[in-house]
Design a protein with these regions (language model features):
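S-adenosyl-L-methionine-dependent methyltransferase catalytic core, i.e., the SAM/SAH-binding region
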Residues: 1-128
């Protein structure tokens, strides 16, 4: 089964004006599933706090909202679900401290030079 075969089957299902975007989403979803990208991302994030020394930094570039939500949750709360855990005194016990309070996105100039960068988001955190 080739990408052209898949495209031939699903193309009639999309409206003409949205066909390119919908096709891109379809192939992105297939790639994510086939490569098990979400599983790999979660495994890497779960082990990051174990392998980094205090003061060590992790920088992650995400390219779509599902990845970004997972990375943001882990960096803010220390877990994939985004549940903030507190100690007895009410202090947040997350293993990371955010380095950049706002996500870093490509400048307009970068996006003009490299259109594929338009969806990229960079998040940086430091091990406590």
């Amino acid at each position: 089964l080739t990408t052209n075969d898949i495209q031939a089957v699903v193309e009639p299902l999309f409206k003409r004006e949205r066909e390119k975007k919908e096709m891109a989403k379809l192939f992105q979803a297939l790639r994510i599933e086939v490569n098990q990208e979400m599983i790999a991302l979660k495994e890497m994030l779960n082990s990051a706090s174990e392998v980094l020394k205090p003061g060590g930094r992790i920088a992650i570039i995400t390219y779509h909202s599902l990845e970004d939500r997972i990375v943001k949750n882990v960096m803010k709360s220390g877990n994939i679900e985004g549940k903030v855990e507190k100690d007895f005194f009410g202090h947040i016990t997350a293993p990371f401290k955010l380095i950049n309070n706002k996500v870093i996105v490509p400048s307009n100039d970068e996006q003009e030079r490299n259109p594929r960068s338009r969806s990229a988001k960079l998040r940086i955190a430091e091990k406590r």
